[in-house]
Each structure stands twice: as C-alpha cells, then as structure tokens.
Amino acid sequence: MSGRDNRGAGGGGGGHQPLSSAMGKLKEKLTRAGDDQGYHRVESNLSTSNTATSLDTILPEDPFLFPQAAPQRHPLPRPQQQQQQQRQQLRLLEDEPPLSFRPLLEDDDINEPPTQPFQQQQQRTPLRASGSLELTPLPPPPTSQEIREHRDRQQRSVPVPVEDLQRSKQSLKGSRVSFEKNNASSKPPAQAESSDEDSFEDKRIGFQQQKATSVDHKGILKDLKHILANDNRRQFQAKKHVSLDVKGTRFLQDLLKESSSEEEFHKTRREFQGRKHQSLDPRVTFKLDKVLQGSSTDSDEEGDDPEHKRLIHRPKDITKPLIIDLKDLESESDEDFHTSRQHFQQQRSISTDSRKSRRPYEMDEMGNKRGENIRHAVPFVRQITEDGKPKLEVYRPTTNPIYIWTQVLAALSVSLGSLVVGFVSAYTSPALVSMTNRNMTSFEVTPQAASWVGGIMPLAGLAGGIAGGPFIEYLGRRNTILATAIPFIVSSLLIACAVNVAMVLAGRFLAGFCVGIASLSLPVYLGETVQPEVRGTLGLLPTAFGNIGILLCFVAGTYMDWSMLAFLGAALPVPFLILMFLIPETPRWFVSRGREEKARKALSWLRGKEADVEPELKGLMRSQADADRQATQNKMMELLKRNNLKPLSISLGLMFFQQLSGINAVIFYTVSIFKDAGSTIDGNLCTIIVGIVNFMATFIATLLIDRAGRKILLYVSNIAMIITLFVLGGFFYCKSHGQDVSQLGWLPLSCFVIYILGFSLGFGPIPWLMMGEILPSKIRGSAASVATAFNWSCTFVVTKTFQDMIDFMGAHGAFWLFGSICFIGLFFVILYVPETQGKTLEDIERKMMGRVRRMSSVANMKPLAFNM
C-alpha cells in the first residue's frame, strides 16, 4: 500500500460499527467532508453496465504538481464485502486532504503523455461510495525548487505511458460531469498552519496552479464533450486548423470530405497550409494569381488541365469565384515557397490601410494635371468594382522619369499613318473634278462611275475593319500597321497609272481596305505604348495628323490633277513605313502571346533603359489574366444579350446619325458642290478653307468636350447642322428654279464653314468617344468592331448614293434629307443618349445596365473575332 493509503488508515480510529449505522450516516458524512475539506463532487449518470467507469480523464493541470498513479480497476464489491469497504472509506474521508480535478482540455494531447515527475508517483486507490461517487486525495504542493526541476525535465519531453488514460477517456463518452467550485480546496489543511515564508510561497504557487482548473466550468464542460465526441483527438487538432480563417478556408470542407484516409487528409492539409496565405487579405490576393508559378516545374508540362483547378468560393468575400490553377501554386521546396511567401507579403503590405483609402484617385485615359500630380505623389490606386462591391487594384507610383522622345517617336510613326488615311479619304474631292474632265484624262468617267470611285473606298473600309480584328490579334499591332504601308503605295500607283476606270476602282478598293485596318490598329497601338501621363497630349496627334492629311489633299488638289495627286499619295506612306521599323511591338501583345522577355525589352525601349519596368510588366500580366478569364468563345451571342443591346443600340445610333448627316458626302464632293453652286469664290480655295476649319475645330472640341459636356455639344452640333443644311437646300432650290442668287455667292461657303465647325464640335468626335464609354467592358472590343463596321457601311451608303440623290431629287432635296435626319437625331440625343461627363465607367454602366462590372483597361479591348 502506498504512503497515501497508510496515512488514511492511521488517521481513522473509529473501530467497527454496525452495518446499518454506517449506511445510515454515509450520505451525511460525505456531504460534511466535501463541504468542510473542499472536495469536488463528481456525479455520473452512467448506465449499470458501465459502473466500472473511472474518472481518470479528469486530470490535474500539471502531472508533476498533482502526481497520480495509473487507475486501478476493481469489479463491483460483493455483498459480503461492502460493509468493510464502506468503513474504510469513512475513515479515509475524515483524514484525507482535499481533492482537485481538471478536465481533459482541448490543448492536451492524449498521445503525448505528461512528463515523468522528479519523484516516484504514488499509488492511488479511488474512493468509492454507493457506486456513483469517486474521490481522490490531493497531495501537498511541491516547493519552488521542485517546480523548476520539473519544468526543466518537461523541456526534455520524457514521456510516460498513459494507456489507462486512453481507456478512461473512452469510458467517459456520454457521461455528464459537473463541477462545484470551492476555494477552500486550494489550500490543504495540513499546510495552512505553517508560518514559514518559504512554505507560504510554495503554497501560494500551488494555489495559483490549482486555481486555473476552476475557470469557466461551463466552457470546460463544453470543450470536454466536444473532445470526447472525436475518436481521434490528434485528427481533431489537425482539422482545427481549418477554423483559423473561416471566411477564406470554408472551401476546404469539400477537400476534407474527399479524404478517404488520415494520411490523405494530412497531405491535403499540408497543401492547404502552403496556400493559405492567399486568404489572409482577400482584397488584394485575388490579384496575386500565380504568385508561386516560378517554383513549379510541372505546370508547363501538364498545361491548363481543368482537373487540376479548384473553385475558391468565399461566401463573404468581395470577389467573384476565382479559378486558380493549383499546379501553378505548387512549390518544389520550402526555400522556393518562403521566397514566394515573402514576395506575397511585400505586395500585401500595400493594402494594410485600405480603410483610409476608400476613395482612391482614378486617372482616366486622357489624364489631367491634377491626376498627374497625385500620381507622382502617392501610389496610383484605381478603384474598380464587381457586383456593386468595392475592390482595389494596386499600381505602383510613377517615380521613373518619362522618356518623352521614345514615346513621341512611336506616336509620330502612328500619326503618319493617320495622315495617309486622311489623304486617301479626301482624295476624291479634288480628284474627281479633273478626272471627269475629258481634256485631262484618257478615259471617260461617267457620273455613275464617279459615284463608285467615291463610294467604293468606304465599302472596302468595312471589309478591312472586320479583317483588322484577327490581324492585330495574331500578327500583332505593329506588324499589321506595317502590312498596310505597302498596299497604300500600290493603291496610289494603280490610280496614278490608270488607263481605265477599273484600275481606279481597284486602287480605291485596296486603299479603302487598308484604311479600315488602319482605323482599328493605329489607336490600339498608341493606347498600349504611351504612358498615362502623356497619353492626353500624344493621343491628339493621330486626329490632328488625319486632318492635316485632308487639308494637304485639298491644297495639293488645287495645283495638281488626279494623276499627280495620286503620285503624291504614293509617296506619303514611305516615311510612315521607315519609322514603323524603328519602334517595337506593344508590350501588351507580347504578354498576350506569352513572350515575357520581349515584352520586357519593349517596355525598356519605351520607358527608358534605366527605368524599372517590372511592376508595370506584372500589371500587364495581371490585366491579361483578367481579360482571359472574362473572354467568351462566342462573341456575337454575347452581343445579343438583353443587357448589352441598349448600350450597343445607342452607339450604333450615334454612328448612324453621324454619317447620315452627310459629312462624307460634303467632304468627298466639296469642289463639285461649290462648282454647282456657282460661288463667286474659287472652288479650290473654298475647299482649302473647309479643310482649315476642320483642322482647327478639332482643337476647339478638345477644349470644350470635358467642360460643356457631351450632350450639350451634341445639341449645338445638331442645331448648327440642321440650320446650315436647310439653308443650303434653300439656296440650291432657288438656283434650280431660275432665281438670281449671284448676290448670295458667299452663302455656300459660310454654310459649309458653320456646318463643318458644328460637326467637328459634336457629332464628329463624340460618337467615337462614347463608344468606349457606354459599351460594357465585357463586350467592348467586339461591340466596337461592330460599331466601326456599321460606320463604314453608312459611309458607303451615303457616298455611293449622294450623286444618285442629286440626280433624283436635286441638290436641294439631298441637303433637306440630311437636315431632316439631323432633326430626328436631335430627339434621339434628348431621349436616349446619356450624359457621361465627369462619371466613372462604373457609374455609366450602372446607369445603362442596372449593375456594375469591373472595368477593363483600354488595352484589354479585344477586336471582334467572329467566332460563330
């Protein structure tokens, strides 16, 4: 028998009492002993078949401070032995020190036994009373020296067997355990009378250690029941990791269900821990896709297999479900993983104070002085939204100097292409005058043939606009532009050397096809190469050079016949061709084709050799990944969806009223119109004046469009065109009916100047501008291609039928028809066209469609591929 049992036996001197007396006083003494000496009461509602259950799972908080021996199992006492055992229990109750119990908590590991104490564990015999009460005496607390030695031994992790503890845990399933707090149990009576200071300090330490067991009994009981409900507590501890970040890791439930074995579960959990960093800050990590791609060696070989992808669904996240290729996130070694994790932490630090930046600054494509200063001062953060909830996309601040000369060279090269386009478009206006003169040509050009010479170019432009989309996608922006230079030269030479109308028509068709391709590829190249800080200034160059080309054609046509004018047109693409060889392909196209190194070289050329292009390159890669995820196979079916039809219809309506205002008919036939009007001013001089007005009006519109608003300028443009067209119609009506209009020779020129000025202020640039503003981002590229093709179709109809309309209804009828269409267009603008001045793209789309999508950048606009 242990020393504890000897003390109990020596302390009880009551002798043998009758059985009835002992049984009668059992309950009273048990209650008094528990109240006076601080016992904890443990009740059990176990069934009779489980009466051998012990309470060994209720352990002391520290196995050294409260040493206990392995539980001893005894069957139920036979009736003839109960009297003697009850007497012994009564003697022990009077002499034993108070008890203390602690339940098995969640942090305890039953497979990792407590450390062996410095002294031999004492044997303990559980005290039983009426088969439902078990009490264990509490030994005296250790001294400070013993505690220090014990903690040193714990660090060496010397295990002891705990097989009985495991069996006891299993036996407590379904049991009900309650605790009663009694602070008196914290101090044994034998130790309370000591006056020695060291003994008092030891007792105080022991009291503090025991006190922890009485904290929040309800919570302890709840945790105890939760632990007892698990067959494998180690597995419970492993699965507990998934609750560390419930919002970001709820998707792991599906992975845990798929685990058929514990080994598979641990493997899945290790993979999850390696990727768990992505859920730390969902506002940023959805943009950090493929952060660990560099540490994977299998991703390139296995490709984008859908079986290796998982859908991360965050119910309370601000992002849409995001597809991440898990193989791109795998890491071959811990070193690679830690390197990637450090990179992630550096990027994540940008959003640590997002609450103070709920209204970050956004710089639109044209830019402004205030936005430029802000971007130089603080990190440029663009706020974009998805389904009405804010989301942040982080860009680095522009700290590198802007190398203007390289970007000016790129913009100048592209703008020379616009000059060629403007010259080709205006060619028929001065050329048809000399071409229809039998004294200046070797072949006859009938009025019907002349209408085809002017109208075939827009028809070919329609075909070129459709073909330009796949060309810039697969050949590249720069290569596509280069491919148009040689056909421009060939087309002009065909016209210059023509011996019949067929050669002229062939040259015009080839030139029109190149115009359609260039009208789509030139602005795309410029938008993808120029920095936002100078995009507003350099973005004006193509429009200005296009008007210069028109003016040059009008001026040269005054002194040259149609053949010499065509030779001049053949010479213009030569400098354009040479300069295009000096500039690189756009970095964004290289990224879209997976050529990262070439994209880096192109950025270095455009931004400067000493510029840090890595942040911008990574931003391009993230934008391309976004565009690829949003891309759909059938673009045309997407256009026909109900939510997309309204903005597309408005864009097509603006294009329709732009061309049906008769602008191209006026430009193409300016000289003929002034000649028929009998103006006292030379027709060629009038044409030059119209070209100058068109050139100057472009700069006026640039100053007013962001101040007066889109709709105001459209109103002014419509009213100006309506008045001038009806006045011109009245002038030609009076002239055709024999009235004397010689005193009004100045009127046609005045009307043409006002008409061109009004058109250039509103219906000239605004339909193209609003096409990029009101079209939804998801269909912006394909819808823009459709709108461009529709614009060229209307141009062809107007230019081809203008001469027929004059022959059928007279010049006055044609101008009145155009004026009536402009009048209808005024009501179209009032009723259907929204005002977009000062509004973000998200606000515009919310108004148009009733919801918000994340706005893609201009470079994400993909041309229509016509995947029917």
Swiss-Prot record:
Residues 1-213, 257-314, 335-367 are annotated as: Disordered. GO terms for molecular function: sugar transmembrane transporter activity; trehalose transmembrane transporter activity. It comes from the Eukaryota. Residues 1-403, 473-484, 530-535, 585-653, 706-711, 773-778, 834-868 are cytoplasmic. GO terms for biological process: trehalose transport. One of its GO terms (cellular component) is plasma membrane. Belongs to the major facilitator superfamily. Sugar transporter (TC 2.A.1.1) family. Trehalose transporter subfamily. Low-capacity facilitative transporter for trehalose. Does not transport maltose, sucrose or lactose. Mediates the bidirectional transfer of trehalose. Responsible for the transport of trehalose synthesized in the fat body and the incorporation of trehalose into other tissues that require a carbon source, thereby regulating trehalose levels in the hemolymph. This is Facilitated trehalose transporter Tret1. It comes from Drosophila pseudoobscura pseudoobscura.
